[in-house]
C-alpha cells in the first residue's frame, strides 16, 4: 500500500497538496500540464523533497521523514545518469553497492536482471557504445537490481523515438507483471499512459484534479479530458 495523506509542499509560491492511495502491484500514470507538480509528487514519494505536512506510508510503513535510501522505492529519470567511464555492468552494479564490491549472489542477480532487460551481451560496453534505448535499459536495470517494490518513472522514455518508446513500455509492462511491482509513471503522452496503466492521475496546479480510468481520458468520457486538449464527450 502506498498512501499519502494531505502531503503538502510549497513550490515557487504554488502550494501543493496530495491525497492518494495505491494498492500493491497497481500501475498508475501521472499526467498534467508542465509545472503542475507531477515530478514534485514523485520526488516527495522518493524522499528527494521533504513535505511541509502530512503523512506518507510506503509498503505499509511510515516514510514521511525517512531518507531516500531508506525508502522501498527506485526511481528512473529522463536523463539516464549513466557514468561514461564505467561499463554497463558497473553502472548497473552501482544500484547494489556504491563501491561496486558485489558478492557472488549480487553478481548473479545483476546477470539475471541484465538478461531480463536484454543487455546480457552488452555488459562490457561503455554507455557511449550503446543506443539510446539500450542506455535507458541499463538505467532501468540499475533500478531493478535494488529489488524495491515501488518503481517511479519520471518521463524516462520521452527522448526516444516512438518505436523505441513503445519497446521500453512493453519491457516495463512485462517487468512489472513478473516482479509484481507498484508503478507510478509521469508522462506527457496519453497514449503512453494508456499502454502502461489502467488508472491515471491528472495533476493540475499542485492538486490531483482527476483520479480514474485512463480510457475515460482517451475517449473523452471524463470531463477532465479537456485539460489534456481532448474534447470531452460529457454534456454539461
UniProtKB/Swiss-Prot annotation:
Record key words, sorted: ATP-binding, Cell inner membrane, Cell membrane, Membrane, Nucleotide-binding, Translocase, Transport
Enzyme category, top tier: translocase
EC number: 7.6.2.15
Residues engaged in binding ATP: 32-39
Record membrane topology: Peripheral membrane protein
Gene3D superfamilies per the UniProt record, alphabetical: P-loop containing nucleotide triphosphate hydrolases
Main location: membrane
Localization, UniProt: Cell inner membrane
Keyword Membrane found: yes
Gene Ontology molecular functions: ABC-type thiamine transporter activity; ATP binding; ATP hydrolysis activity
PROSITE patterns given in the database record: ABC_TRANSPORTER_1, ABC_TRANSPORTER_2, THIQ
The ABC transporter domain, residue ranges: 2-230
GO CC annotation, single: plasma membrane
Domain of life: Bacteria
Catalytic activity annotation: thiamine(out) + ATP + H2O = thiamine(in) + ADP + phosphate + H(+)
Family per record: Belongs to the ABC transporter superfamily. Thiamine importer (TC 3.A.1.19.1) family.
PANTHER family cross-referenced by the UniProt entry: SPERMIDINE/PUTRESCINE IMPORT ATP-BINDING PROTEIN POTA, THIAMINE IMPORT ATP-BINDING PROTEIN THIQ
Function: Part of the ABC transporter complex ThiBPQ involved in thiamine import. Responsible for energy coupling to the transport system.
Subunit structure: The complex is composed of two ATP-binding proteins (ThiQ), two transmembrane proteins (ThiP) and a solute-binding protein (ThiB).
Protein name: Thiamine import ATP-binding protein ThiQ
Protein species of origin: Yersinia pestis
Amino acid at each position: 500500500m502506498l498512501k499519502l495523506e494531505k502531503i503538502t509542499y510549497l513550490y515557487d509560491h504554488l502550494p501543493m497538496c496530495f491525497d492518494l492511495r495505491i494498492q500493491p502491484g497497481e500501475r498508475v500514470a501521472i499526467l498534467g500540464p508542465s509545472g503542475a507538480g507531477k515530478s514534485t509528487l514523485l520526488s516527495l514519494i522518493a524522499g528527494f523533497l521533504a513535505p511541509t505536512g502530512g503523512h506518507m506510508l510506503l509498503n505499509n510503513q511510515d516514510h514521511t521523514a525517512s531518507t531516500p535510501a531508506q525508502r522501498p522505492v527506485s526511481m528512473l529519470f529522463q536523463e539516464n545518469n549513466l557514468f561514461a567511464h564505467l561499463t554497463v555492468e558497473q553502472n548497473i552494479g552501482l544500484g547494489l553497492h556504491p563501491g561496486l564490491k558485489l558478492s557472488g549472489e549480487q553478481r548473479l542477480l545483476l546477470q539475471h536482471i541484465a538478461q531480463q532487460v536484454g543487455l546480457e551481451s552488452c555488459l562490457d560496453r561503455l554507455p557511449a557504445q550503446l543506443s539510446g534505448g539500450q542506455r535507458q535499459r541499463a538505467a532501468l536495470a540499475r533500478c531493478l537490481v535494488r529489488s524495491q517494490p515501488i518503481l517511479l518513472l519520471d518521463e524516462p522514455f520521452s527522448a526516444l523515438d516512438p518505436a523505441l518508446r513503445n519497446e521500453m513500455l512493453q519491457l516495463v509492462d512485462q517487468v512489472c507483471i513478473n516482479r509484481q511491482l507498484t508503478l507510478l509513471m509521469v508522462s506527457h503522452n496519453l497514449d503512453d499512459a494508456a499502454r502502461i496503466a489502467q488508472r491515471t492521475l491528472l495533476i493540475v496546479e499542485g492538486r490531483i484534479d482527476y483520479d480514474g480510468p485512463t480510457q475515460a481520458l482517451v475517449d473523452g468520457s471524463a470531463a477532465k479530458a479537456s485539460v489534456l486538449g481532448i474534447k470531452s464527450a460529457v454534456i454539461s
